[in-house]
């Protein structure tokens, strides 16, 4: 079972992992994967301590060399902080975290976006050039500050493993 908690990029949850995992674990004994704001090996270990079996990272992997994301998206992630992440239901009718800079680059004003009343996962917006979420409007999790460079996925995985082992060794 994948739990998307508060802080996740894209369509996000509203409950923190600290509350979500124990609540689900109280009635579900199968595998749990926790996502949302996990950016390093210590966060993966924290997910396990909470009762999850795995931690899920998304935003960090978008900025890897192997990612199919446009270079401009990856560069935007490297430059971003949590202050650049905006929660809005404007594009799909479902709240999601997006990079404000991508909204601005698409010719929209983040301060004037209104939530859709309907739900549509086409992600279209009737603004300049009919921008589309996932193509023109890019998501990121609140832990985006941890994306400090574009690197090979293998390098990121090795870093996460080392951080995880360090966190696991702590009493």
Can you say where each PLM-predicted feature lies in the sequence?
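Conserved active-site-proximal phosphate/metal-binding subdomains
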Residues: 17-33, 39-171
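Short, small-residue-enriched loops and turns at beta-alpha junctions
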Residues: 8-13, 63
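Glycine/charged-rich beta-loop-alpha catalytic/anionic-binding loops adjacent to active sites
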Residues: 5-7, 29
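Conserved beta-strand positions in the central sheet of alpha/beta enzyme cores
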Residues: 2-3, 56
């Amino acid at each position: 079972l994948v739990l998307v908690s508060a802080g996740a990029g894209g369509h996000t949850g509203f409950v923190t992992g600290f509350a979500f995992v124990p609540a689900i674990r109280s009635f579900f004994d199968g595998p749990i994967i926790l996502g949302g704001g996990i950016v390093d090996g210590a966060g993966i270990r924290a997910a396990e301590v909470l009762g999850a079996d795995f931690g899920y990272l998304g935003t960090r992997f978008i900025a890897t060399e192997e990612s199919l994301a446009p270079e401009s998206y990856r560069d935007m992630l490297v430059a971003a902080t949590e202050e650049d992440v905006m929660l809005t239901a404007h594009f799909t009718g479902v709240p999601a975290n997006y990079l404000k800079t991508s909204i601005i680059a698409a010719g929209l004003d983040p301060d004037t976006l209104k939530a859709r009343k309907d739900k549509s996962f086409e992600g279209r917006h009737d603004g300049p050039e009919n921008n589309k979420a996932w193509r023109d409007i890019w998501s990121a999790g609140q832990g985006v500050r941890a994306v400090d460079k574009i690197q090979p996925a293998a390098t990121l995985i090795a870093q996460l493993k080392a951080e995880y082992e360090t966190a696991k060794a702590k009493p």
